[in-house]
Each structure stands twice: as structure tokens, then as C-alpha cells.
From Swiss-Prot:
Family statement: Belongs to the DMRL synthase family.
Organism: Oleidesulfovibrio alaskensis (strain ATCC BAA-1058 / DSM 17464 / G20) (Desulfovibrio alaskensis)
Active site: H91 (proton donor)
Gene designation: ribH
Name of the protein described by the UniProt record: 6,7-dimethyl-8-ribityllumazine synthase
Taxon lineage: Bacteria, Pseudomonadati, Thermodesulfobacteriota, Desulfovibrionia, Desulfovibrionales
GO MF entries: 6,7-dimethyl-8-ribityllumazine synthase activity
EC number(s) on file: 2.5.1.78
Length: 156
């Protein structure tokens, strides 16, 4: 097999600054995501002093805050954590779609990695599973993705 130069990110958060956006809506789930992200970054050498938690009402507000945080130059990465649980109306679809598109747009336009930890589930049980039980913790996964992406981008 041909050997290729490979660029990979190291999981070392030392010296990096993170903005963690967390929604208040469904906070009983979101708080578990935040705990997972903070714990993960700390285990990777990050300092709690280099993490800023920003609380917002809901997922729809996340992109505008992420945009301002990314543009500030104060953060190496933004981690967006929230939970949108399907209800009886189409509101879920509008919020989930626009928040998702907006967060992706922020990352592309700013060049600052944005971790997508917005749960979009059909039931409360599914959200709980993804916030630290059977489905792992998506807050950890979002933090890990941001950390690895930061370290890869440093090498490009």
C-alpha cells in the first residue's frame, strides 16, 4: 500500500479557549451535555478558566451567538449544546433545521470550528440516552470533534 502524508489532530486542549453555548430549554438534558464536554476537555489538558459557558433560551438563538463568539477572536472553538425534542407541531423541524444550517454556516464563514452537540430527537428518552446513558454523551463527541478539528487546522 502506498504511504500517504497524514494530518491528524492531537487530543490536547492545553492552552486552547472554548466557548460552550448551552440552551436553557430542556436544560435537564443539556446540563449533562455540558458536563460531558467540560469533563472531556479537562481530561485532555484543558483548563476550566479557558472555557466560557454561554446560556441561551433555545436552539434557534445558537447560530447568532456562535457567529459573534467566533468573530470575537477570543476562542479557538465553539461547542453548541442543546436538545430539540419533537412535539405535535412542525415547530421542531423549523428549529432543528435552521439551528443546524446556521451553526454550519458560522463554521464555514469564520473558519472557527463549531462542535455540533444539538440533539434532535423524537422523544425525551432518546435525548436522555444521548446525554450520558446508552447512547454515550454527545457533548463529549462535540467537544472531541472541535478539539481534533482545531489541531488539524493548525497543520493545514
Amino acid at each position: 500500500m502506498m504511504h500517504l502524508k497524514t494530518i491528524e489532530g492531537q487530543f490536547d486542549a492545553k492552552g486552547l479557549k472554548f466557548a460552550i453555548i448551552a440552551t436553557r430549554f430542556n436544560d435537564f438534558v443539556v446540563d449533562r451535555l455540558v458536563g460531558g464536554a467540560v469533563d472531556y476537555l479537562t481530561r485532555c489538558g484543558g483548563s476550566r478558566e479557558d472555557m466560557t459557558l454561554i446560556r441561551l433560551p433555545g436552539a434557534f438563538e445558537m447560530p447568532v451567538a456562535a457567529k459573534k463568539l467566533a468573530a470575537s477572536g477570543k476562542y479557538d472553538g465553539v461547542i453548541a449544546l442543546g436538545a430539540v425534542i419533537r412535539g405535535a407541531t412542525p415547530h421542531f423541524d423549523f428549529v432543528a433545521n435552521e439551528a443546524t444550517k446556521g451553526l454550519a454556516q458560522v463554521a464555514l464563514e469564520s473558519g472557527v470550528p463549531v462542535g455540533f452537540g444539538l440533539l434532535t430527537t423524537d422523544t425525551l428518552e432518546q435525548a436522555i440516552e444521548r446525554a450520558g446513558s446508552k447512547g454515550g454523551n454527545k457533548g463529549v463527541e462535540a467537544a472531541s470533534a472541535v478539539l481534533e478539528t482545531i489541531r488539524v487546522l493548525e497543520q493545514l
